[in-house]
C-alpha cells in the first residue's frame, strides 16, 4: 500500500492521522472554532459545509474557504458536504451537490474533497478528474447509519471506490452488536492486506464501535475522527484522549 503525503502529513504510515471537524453554522463561529481546533494540533481539519448557514451560495462558500485556508495554515483542509441521506444536516439537489464540490475544488483552497460513492459512477469520476486537475485528493465515502453490511459488501464498496479513482476510500457503518464491530474490523484487515493499494479509512460508529476508531494502526484504517468543539458522528471522542490511546498502541506494537 502506498502512502499519501499532503503538505507535511503522511497518510498511510505510522499512527492513524487525526481528522477534526468544524461544525459551526456561521462565519464568525467557524473562525472561532478553527482557532480552537488549531490548538488541538489535528493532522487534518474537515469543514462540514452541510452545517454552514450560507452553503446555498457558492460565492459565500468560496469566501469562507479562503478564510478557513488562511486560518488552517499548514494543516491539510478537507471539504465535506455530507448529504442528508448519509447523515448530513441539509437536503440539496444532486446537481447542486456536484457543482458545490467542483466549486470548492477549483478554489484550490482545499487539500482533500469528500465525495459520496453512491452519488453515481459518472458523477464521482467527474469529481475525481476535477480534483486531480486542481491538485486535490479525493476521499470517496459511504455511511450507513442503520446497519453494518456483510464483510463482502463492505469490501466491495471499498474496492469500487478504489476502481473509481478515490485516493482514500472511506466507509462508516453502524453496529447493532459487538459482532458487527468484528465484521468491520475483519473487512478492514482483509481490504488492506489483499486489495488496497492506497490508504483507507473505516470505522464502526457509536460507543459500541469505539475500538475501531482507536485501533486503526492494528487493522488498517489510516485516519480517525476526533471531536473538537462538537462531534460530527456518534462515537467520536475528544482529540487529546484519542491521541493518547493512539500513541500508547503505537509505542507497544
Curated annotation (Swiss-Prot):
Substrates-to-products reaction catalysed: 3-dehydroquinate = 3-dehydroshikimate + H2O
Query: What EC number(s) is this enzyme filed under?
Result: 4.2.1.10
Q: Active site at which residues?
A: 143 (proton donor/acceptor), 170 (schiff-base intermediate with substrate)
> Pfam families, from UniProt?
DHquinase_I
Signal peptide span: none
Binding of 3-dehydroquinate: at which residues?
A: 46-48, 82, 213, 232, 236
Question: What InterPro entries does the database record attribute to this sequence?
Answer: 3-dehydroquinate_DH_AS, Aldolase_TIM, DHquinase_I, Type-I_3-dehydroquinase
What is the designated name of this protein? 3-dehydroquinate dehydratase
